[in-house]
Curated annotation (Swiss-Prot):
Source organism (scientific name): Bacillus cytotoxicus (strain DSM 22905 / CIP 110041 / 391-98 / NVH 391-98)
Function, in words: Phosphorolytic 3'-5' exoribonuclease that plays an important role in tRNA 3'-end maturation. Removes nucleotide residues following the 3'-CCA terminus of tRNAs; can also add nucleotides to the ends of RNA molecules by using nucleoside diphosphates as substrates, but this may not be physiologically important. Probably plays a role in initiation of 16S rRNA degradation (leading to ribosome degradation) during starvation.
Protein name in UniProt: Ribonuclease PH
E.C. number: 2.7.7.56
Taxonomic placement: Bacteria, Bacillati, Bacillota, Bacilli, Bacillales
UniProt similarity note: Belongs to the RNase PH family.
Example GO BP: tRNA processing
Superkingdom assignment: Bacteria
Reaction catalyzed: tRNA(n+1) + phosphate = tRNA(n) + a ribonucleoside 5'-diphosphate
């Protein structure tokens, strides 16, 4: 039994509140246990200069935490005048993951801005951001479809992410909270599509190593969790699912 009473292959409670914000084309509040992230999707009728004239769109992301998302207040990065390496890595990861399942040609010469703002952090903020951002993005695409700006919702598959790790007492566990993540021997983030294809795997031994057999066990646990997360996405999207499947 884990610190919060879950089984080793059990996700935290997941809830996705759609249309959480008034102004964006798509928005959600995703809750994964005590981690809460607001994800919004904004559509601009232009692309970055390097994409002009190619007839394709672009998806990019920004990520941030409010100061008291964590136990101790952190200084806003805007106050520091620069984005940290961690933040840059996460927002590139989010954009890269989403682009893997978007049909950029169907999107046309538009940019989708994904903004992920962590309002409470208890581990897994980047994976929750990806899972929530996918839903926000599809909601924005559905508005483009309603406005007849696209011929179909420009996504090729579902996309979700979770964390897995190895704890000394429990072995391989799914969806680590902060207390577990801070003492894990191995920590891994996994992004997968609905068809079971990997988009990205980030795994690190924390003063420890892991075997090929453990790697397979980690990936199996991640897939188990991601398939459940995709079902949560489908529930949140409702009738829009018929335009994806």
């Amino acid at each position: 039994m884990r610190v919060d009473g879950r089984e080793v292959r059990e996700l935290r409670h997941v809830h996705i509140h759609t249309n959480y914000l008034k102004h964006p084309e798509g928005s959600v509040l995703i809750e994964v246990g005590d981690t809460k992230v607001i994800c919004s999707a904004t559509v601009e009728e232009r692309v970055p200069p390097f994409m002009r004239g190619e007839g394709k769109g672009w998806v990019t992301a920004e990520y941030a935490m409010i100061p008291r998302a964590t136990e101790q207040r952190t200084i806003r990065e805007s106050s520091k005048g620069k984005v940290t390496g961690r933040t840059m890595e996460i927002q590139r990861l989010i954009g890269r993951a989403l682009r893997a399942v978007v049909d950029l040609e169907v999107l046309g010469e538009r940019t989708v801005w994904i903004d992920c703002d962590v309002i409470q952090a208890d581990g897994g903020t980047r994976t929750a951001s990806i899972t929530g951002a996918y839903v926000a993005m599809v909601l924005a695409f559905e508005k483009l479809l309603q406005a007849e700006k696209v011929t179909k919702i420009p996504v090729k598959d579902y996309l979700a992410a979770t964390s897995v790790g190895i704890l000394e007492e429990q072995g391989v566990v799914l969806d680590l909270n902060y207390a577990e993540d801070s003492k894990a021997d191995v920590d891994m983030n996994v992004i997968m599509t609905g068809k079971g294809h990997f988009v990205e795997v980030q795994g690190t031994g924390e003063e420890a190593t892991f075997s090929r057999a453990q790697l397979n066990e980690l990936l199996d646990a991640a897939e188990h969790g991601i398939l459940q997360l995709i079902e949560k996405q489908k529930e949140a999207l409702g009738d829009i699912v018929s335009h994806i499947e």
